[in-house]
C-alpha cells in the first residue's frame, strides 16, 4: 500500500523482496531482448561494493555479452536498436537454460536473500534446481535457481532508454535510474514515456543553449525539451492537436516539469509577445493555488490544463487555462507543519506600508487561519520577493491596479474573517459576533454594512411553507458559516483571476484549431488520514491511469488485432474495476455519496455504513471500523475517513451570505455573488429542498468534478498524448538521496515495465498504405503511377532494405518498430532538399533570363517615353517663353513711354519756370535801361557793350571747352560701346556653337530613337523639322532678350534724371524762400522795426557765408545734372538735342550771370 511505504533503503542490498515488478522472473518469464547502448560503464554491484570477476576480459566470445556479439547486434539494428537474441521466450522455458548457460559462462545475477533483500552475486556452481552464489564480501549462499534474476552487463550501465536493457526486471530498472540520478541525468526514456526523477536542486540541463540544441536536434538525450519538440513538430506535420500529460505523486516535480515544457514551447513559438504572458501566469497560479504540505513545499492544490494555441506557422497565438477542484478547505484549516496558500504569507511579508495601512495588515502570526499550523516560512523562499513577482505578473496579464488592490482586499478580508470571534448570548448556546477590530475590518474591506455582516454570521433565514423563519446559530454553526464565507470568497477570487488571465490570453480571430495541451494535475496521495480531497484526487488519478492504459496498452493491442499483424500480447494491470467502483450507478461511491448528501439527516457515519452495505462485495473496496473504508487503487490501498465528506461534497453557502456579498459596494464581492447565483439556478431536488431548506446548489462537488474529468478525458482523447512520469526519489526533499523502495513503488504505479515491454515487442509507428505511398512513393526509381498503394509501399520497403522483422504489413496500415520510420524520413528529407536546391537553381536561371529581357524592354520603353515627354515639355516651354517675351516687351514699351512722357512734362515745367525767371530779369533790365539809359553818356554805353561782349566771348570759350570735353567723353563711350559690341558678338558666336552642339545631340537622340523604333520612320522628318524650328526660335529669343535689356537700361536712366531735376528744383525754391525770409527779418531788426536780442550785422555776415556755401554746392550738383541730361540727350536724340540743351544751359547761365 502507498501509505504504508516507510522504506529508507540505501541500496538494493536492503530492498525487501516483496517489491517486485509484475514481470519479474518469480512471477513471469524473463524478457530477453538486448538493445546495445551507445556506450558503457563499469558497475560495482548495487551498492558499489561488489565487482565483476574478471571484467570484460573474462567474458567468452560465445557469450551474448561478448564484444563481438554486441557489435554484431548493433550493426543489425541500425535505426531501431532492437536485436532479438535466442534466449528463453516461450512460456514453457524456465530458468533451466539460463542456469546451464550461467554454469558455463560465469554471469552476474540479482539474488533474493533469505531476509528478503536483493543483492548482486555470481554463480559458482549448480546442482539440480539449486545454485551456489557468491555475493558481496565473499558470502556464499545456496538458493533456488528459479529465484535468480540476471543482471545486465556493465556496458549497459546508465543507458538513456530502458528498452536497451538486455534483462528487464525490477533491480535492473531501479539500478539504471539510480545510476543516472547520481550523475544528474534525471531523464530516462521508457519507450514512449519519459521518466523524470526530481533532483531537488538546480541541474545544468536547461536554458537557451539547451533549447537551441533540441530545436536543431543536435542533442538526442531524453529531456522534457525533446517531448515538447516532438509535440510541436507532430502538431505541424500531422495537423493534429497534441497533449503533454504529466503525472506523479505529490512532490515529484510535475509543476516544474510543466513550466519547463511551457518554456520550450514559448521559445519555439514565440515572437508575438503572448508567450511572455503565458509564462507569467505561473507565478500567479502558484501563489493562489499552491501550498506547502508535508511532502512538498510547493504542492499544487488544484489541477490545471493549459491549452496553448498556435498559428499555421507554428507561432503561439493565445492560450486558455482550465482549473479543477481547488482545495478550499486549506483556506480555513491546515495540518501541523503545513501552510495555507502562498499568497497569504506573501501579502503579509511583501505589502507596502501604504497597502498595509489600507488593508490593516499585520504579521502572518496574528491570523488564526495561518497560525494554527505553526508554519510561516519555507526554507530558501523569500515571500516578500515572491509577492513583488506576483504583482509584476498581474501587470503583465493586464489586471489593473484598481483590481489588484481589490484582490488584496479580498485576501485580507479572508484573513480577518478567521479572527472574527463569537460571544454566547443565551443558555441555548446561541452566539453573535464580537464587535471588535476583526469584524469592522472585514466589513470595510468587502464594502458591506457591519450590521448586515453580524446578521449573516449569527442568524439564518429559513423559508418554510412560504414563511420566513429567523434561526439563531449556535457556536459551531456560526463558525461553519464564517469559514464557509471565507472559503467561498477565496474560491470565487481564484476563479475570477483565472477568468481574467484567460481574457488576457484569448486567441480570438487568430484561432486555427492547432493546440498543445499541458496537463498538470495533483498526484496520487495517501496520508495517515485521508479525507474528501484525497478521495477526489485519487479518483482523478485513476481516470488518468485509465487513459494511460487505454492509449499505451488497450488501443495499441486492439489495433494490432484489427489489422491482423503478428505480435506478442503483453499483460498489464487494468484499473477498470476500481473506476467502476467510483462511477457505477446507482451503487458506486460517487452515486451513494450524492444520495446521502441530499438527505437532511445524513451524517458521515450513515454514509460509511451505506458504503459498507452496498460495496463490500467489490474486490476493490473494504469496509473498516467506524467511519473508515479502504479502496484498492492502482497505486496501492488507501484508507479514507468519511468525516467531513458530506459537508465538503455539499459545499453549502447559505443564501444570506450570498445576499451579503451582493449588497457590498466593492465590485468583486458582487461578481462573486452573481457567479454563485448562476451556479444555483437549477437547484438539486431532494428531501432537503422539499423541507424548506434555504441552501441549494445545482450539483454536488463530486458530481461536478466527475463531469469535469469526463470533459477532460474527451479533450485528451482527441489529441496525440505524450506522457511524462515524474518520480519522487525521497520523502525529505533532499538532493542526492535515492530511496529505492519509494521509487520502486512509484514505478509500479506508473506501469513502466509494461510500457517498455509493449514498446519492445510492439510497433509504435504506424501509417496507412495510401499515406505511406503518397509520402515516400517519389523515392522509388521506377514508375508507380499504375500501382496500388500496398504494392508501392512494399516496393519502398524493399528498395531501402528494411528488414522483415522491423515492420509488419496490416490490412490497412504498415507497422514499424522504433526508429525505422526515421530512416525513411531522413532519406525523404535529403531527397526533398536536393529537389528544392535543383528547382531553386533552375528557377533562378529562368528568373535571371526573364529579368534580363525585361530590363532590355524597359530600357527601350523608358527611352521612348522619356524622349516623347521631353519633346512635349520643350514645346510647351517654348510657347510659354515666346508668350512671356511678347508680354514683357509690350509692358516694357508701355512703361518706357509713360516714363518718357513724364520726363518730357517735367522738363517742360522746369524750362518754363527758368524761362519765366529769365524773362522777368530781362524785363527789369529793360525797364532800368529805359528809365535811366538816356541820361548816360556814350562812353558808359560803350563800356557796357564792351563788358557784355567780353562776357559773351568768355561764355563762348567755356562752351567750346565743354563741347570738346563732351566730344572726348563721347569718344570714350564709343570705345566702350565697341568693346561691348565685340563681347556681344563673342557671346553670339558661343551661343551659336552651343546651339549647333545641341542640334547635333538632338539629331543623335533622334537617330537612336529611329533605330529602336523602326516602325516610326514617318515621324523622323517631323522631329527634324521641329529641331530646326526650335533653333530659330531660340535665336529670336536671344535677340529679343538683348533688346529688352537695352530698353530697360535706357528707361531706367531717364527715370533717374527726372528724379534728380525734380529734387534740384524743389531745393532751389525752398532755399530761396528760407534765405529771403532770414534776410528780411535781419533788415527789420537792423532798422528797428522788430526787437531781437542779436547782432544784425554779424548775423547778416553769417547768413551770407551760409548762402555762398550752399551756392557752391548747388552749382556742383547742377553741373552733374547737366552731364547726366547731356548723356541722355545724346543717346536719344543725337546731336540736335545736345545743341538744344547746350543752348538752354547757356541761356540759363547767361541769365544767372
Swiss-Prot record:
Residues 1024-1033 have a biased composition (Polar residues). GO terms for biological process: actin filament-based movement. Residues 948-996 form a coiled coil. Pfam families: IQ, Myosin_head, SH3_VIII-1_N. ATP binds at residues 248-255, 296-304. Transmembrane segments: none annotated. Residues 581-615, 709-731 are annotated as: Actin-binding. Residues 831-860, 854-883, 903-932 form the IQ domain. Keywords: Actin-binding, ATP-binding, Calmodulin-binding, Coiled coil, Motor protein, Myosin, Nucleotide-binding, Repeat. Residues 1020-1050 are annotated as: Disordered. One of its GO terms (cellular component) is cytosol. It comes from the Eukaryota. GO terms for molecular function: actin binding; ATP binding; calmodulin binding; cytoskeletal motor activity. Residues 157-829 form the Myosin motor domain. Residues 104-153 form the Myosin N-terminal SH3-like domain. Homodimer. IQ domain mediates interaction with calmodulin. Myosin heavy chain that is required for the cell cycle-regulated transport of various organelles and proteins for their segregation. Functions by binding with its tail domain to receptor proteins on organelles and exerting force with its N-terminal motor domain against actin filaments, thereby transporting its cargo along polarized actin cables. Belongs to the TRAFAC class myosin-kinesin ATPase superfamily. Myosin family. Plant myosin class VIII subfamily. This is Myosin-3. It comes from Arabidopsis thaliana.
